[in-house]
Structure formats: C-alpha cells, structure tokens
Amino acid sequence: MQQSTLLKPVSCYGIGVHSGKRTQLTIEPAKENTGIIFIRTDISSENNYIEASYLNVSGTLLSTTISNDHKVQISTIEHLMAALWGCEIDNAIIKIDGPEVPIMDGSSKLFVFMIECAGKKLQNAPRKYLKILKDIKVIHKDCELYCTPSNHMTVDLTIDFNSKAIGKQNLSFSNQESFTKNIADARTFGFIKDVHDLQSKGLALGASFENAIAINEEDKILNPNGLRYEDEFVRHKLLDLFGDLYTSGTNVVSSIKGYKTSHALNNELLHKIFCDTTSYKFVTASEL
C-alpha cells in the first residue's frame, strides 16, 4: 500500500460549532511523509502551523483542540481527521482562516465529499501502520479504552447515557472502507438542558439543528428529520475515536475496545502507547 494525498485543493466555508465564527478551510495536496499539517492563514507569521499530532492536543472538552508552542490553536479537528483517515489520505495541508474547523452538518460526510471531489493521488512511498504489540488500557472512573495486538484493525465500542433517547448502544467495526458509507454521516449530539451553561462558557455558540442532534428535557429528538440511524449516537462516537486516533500520524492496527469513551480518553491512549517503545512498531502493509 502506498501513501496518498489529494489530486487538487478543495475548499469549504462554514461556522464553528463552539466559537460560532465563520471560517474558510482548504485541503491541499502534500508531499510524501508530510502527514497532516494545519496552517492558520489569518495569522501572518511563520509560527502559524500546527502538526495534527497527539502531542499537540491541548484541549479535549467536547472536541479536540491542537496548539503549537506559540499558543496558536485550532479546535474541533476530529471530524475532518476522521474523514482523512476514512478516505486514506496520508498527507495534506489544511489551511484555515480562523480558530475552529467548520462543523458542517455535524458529521464527516461533507469532508468526505470534498476529498472525493478533489480525487486521490498515490505517492511514491509506502503507507506506515502503527502495529500494537502488547495490551494497553486507560481507565477514568467508569470509562475505559484498551487495545490488544491484532493483525487487523477492529473496534468494539459501547456508549451508555442516562437518556431514553440514547441509552446503551454498541457497535463493532472492522472495515475501514465501510467508514464513508456507514459511519461518516453520523452527527454530533447534545442536550438542550446544557446549552445555556455551555454558551456561558463560550461553547456551542454555533450549534443548531443543522449541525447537531438536539435532545430535550423529555428525551425527545428535536430535529425535524429525526435520526439518520437508530444507533447514530454510537456511530458518531466511533467517528470521533477514528479522528482522534489519526493524530497518531498513521493507521493504528489493533483490536480496540471502548466503553463510554471521550476525546480525553482517546488522547490518553495514544500517550500511553507511545510512552513505551516496546508496545508498538511501525510497519508497512507487507509486514502486518
């Protein structure tokens, strides 16, 4: 398997779900072994770029935020990162003229559409895989996430909310190629009762029925068209997991199991993997 990038640049324009600010975002092709790099074009400085790395994750409250050493940051990168992972884009430059990736419809669907419109170009370098060599677990209260050695990527994810609209949902996933059809269009979600508190903290300022599933105090879905899937909630949590894991810089090959995962837990797992050099190795497809 070879690395890949886009054939040509592609752009979108939208609002940030938390900041409420409108930004333009462009995904551009990049050379082999570049990885995913974000550039804040509204900051005229050589310090305006941020590598999409787990090491640069500086915030995990309701979304994933990355920052560089100069305090330049970009938030809510996970849906775009999931689309890049699902479309098998190894190298890309993301240019954005504001502090937050547009939320679009609350899923990865439109980012996948953009990438498919741009087209994909194979490159003259082998794709790298992060092969897990030993059992690794992270736990926070009743939330847990762990990975075990495997020659294939599989995920078993369970969510459990004290809400009749969501409840307990489980989903197993083992085919990266099915991401764009079965996971990418699952939307983010939230509770109406939390909106006032979140907005008082500068969050959810751009949230609407157009970009999130809204659940009221009576546990009713308020969106006029309802859900896209009966289990859309766990599908979206799986989407978030893939986006966060792609900040490893490559494709994780492991059997992964999670219960009530979060952006913080996802990032903690990567830190725990990389802090022990005997727990992983980078391989090519032929070495899996």
UniProtKB/Swiss-Prot annotation:
Protein's UniProt keywords contain Lipid biosynthesis: yes
GO biological process, one term: lipid A biosynthetic process
Catalyzed chemical reaction(s): a UDP-3-O-[(3R)-3-hydroxyacyl]-N-acetyl-alpha-D-glucosamine + H2O = a UDP-3-O-[(3R)-3-hydroxyacyl]-alpha-D-glucosamine + acetate
Active-site residues, as the UniProt record annotates them: 263
Binding-site positions, Zn(2+): 79, 236, 240
Gene Ontology CC: one annotated term: membrane
UniProt EC number: 3.5.1.108
Pathway assigned to this chain's UniProt record: Glycolipid biosynthesis; lipid IV(A) biosynthesis; lipid IV(A) from (3R)-3-hydroxytetradecanoyl-[acyl-carrier-protein] and UDP-N-acetyl-alpha-D-glucosamine: step 2/6
Keywords in alphabetical order: Hydrolase, Lipid A biosynthesis, Lipid biosynthesis, Lipid metabolism, Metal-binding, Zinc
Record's keyword annotation contains Lipid metabolism: yes
Any Pfam family the entry gives: LpxC
CC cofactor: Zn(2+)
Gene3D superfamilies referenced in this protein's UniProt entry, alphabetically: lpxc deacetylase, domain 1, lpxc deacetylase, domain 2
Homology family: Belongs to the LpxC family.
Function as written in the Swiss-Prot or TrEMBL entry: Catalyzes the hydrolysis of UDP-3-O-myristoyl-N-acetylglucosamine to form UDP-3-O-myristoylglucosamine and acetate, the committed step in lipid A biosynthesis.
Protein name (record): UDP-3-O-acyl-N-acetylglucosamine deacetylase
Species: Rickettsia canadensis (strain McKiel)
Gene this chain is encoded by: lpxC
